A protein has these predicted regions:
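Active-site loop segments of alpha/beta catalytic cores
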Residues: 1-250
Length: 250
């Protein structure tokens, strides 16, 4: 059906499975977030064993996907951002049988926002490392502010993009990211939801991001996401995009 609709306009091709391998999102369904956070303190061995079993399960799933040639390849997106790179696919790539080293993965642990950097390192970064290392490249983060946990995120050897959410301190984030990673900024979408669309506020907000990334030599991308409403004015989206392009010199 897609081929019939878009033939001649868009290239249509079959794709395999694009893995989403979060440890903590499934846990939030099995236990409440509150119970899981208490368990880290009260039952750390239980939590470590639960995470270890999940990691073993994910790695086994990847083994099966690779063996059967069911993984995706040539991703256009990785967790709402462009999957642009000249580092992938890996050497020896076989489009009929792609492997995890040919593609991006994304990691996140939003429910660990309130834990210390050391706990984040122990229960997320170190536990997830076998999964991270299995893939070609890693995009890390979502809505969780990582400004005080950048040192831990940077331990991931193949991380290339790091999320800078609306709740993150941009100065701290940029000082850690520098030119080593993509500064994947998620500007505040609330500016599109006000009763009156204030273009000056949008410009000020975006300019601050461009300035801090420029001062620290950060490669920058702007990702507008998590939009709740545009107050029945979809033109706010195009105006936001126009302002962003004007600021970055596009």
């Amino acid at each position: 059906i897609a081929h019939d609709l878009f033939n001649g306009t868009l290239g249509i091709f079959e794709q395999g499975y694009d893995p989403y391998l979060s440890l903590w999102d499934p846990i939030s369904h099995w236990m409440s977030v509150e119970q899981a956070l208490y368990a880290i303190v009260d039952r750390p061995e239980f939590v470590r064993e639960m995470l270890s079993r999940m990691v073993r399960g994910y790695l086994s799933m990847l083994d099966q996907l690779e063996e059967q040639g069911l993984l995706c390849h040539h991703q256009s997106l990785i967790h709402c951002t462009g999957a642009y790179t000249d580092e992938l696919p890996s050497k020896g790539f076989d489009p009929k049988k792609p492997v995890a080293k040919d593609i991006w993965m994304f990691g996140l642990a939003q429910m660990l926002t309130t834990v210390s950097p050391d706990m984040f390192d122990e229960f997320e970064i170190e536990m997830s490392m076998p999964i991270f290392e299995r893939f070609g490249l890693v995009y890390y983060g979502c809505c969780d502010p990582l400004d005080r946990k950048m040192k831990q995120v940077k331990k991931i050897p193949n991380v290339r993009k790091i999320s800078v959410s609306p709740w993150a301190d941009e100065e701290m984030s940029a000082a850690e990211i520098k030119s080593d990673y993509v500064y994947s900024r998620k500007p505040n979408p609330a500016l599109l939801a006000w009763p009156e669309f204030n273009e000056d506020e949008v410009r000020k907000h975006l300019q601050a991001t461009v300035d801090v990334s420029a001062r620290n030599g950060c490669p920058l991308e702007l990702i507008l996401k998590d939009i709740s409403t545009v107050k029945y004015e979809p033109t706010r989206l195009s105006r936001w995009a126009d302002i962003a392009m004007d600021i970055v010199g596009g």
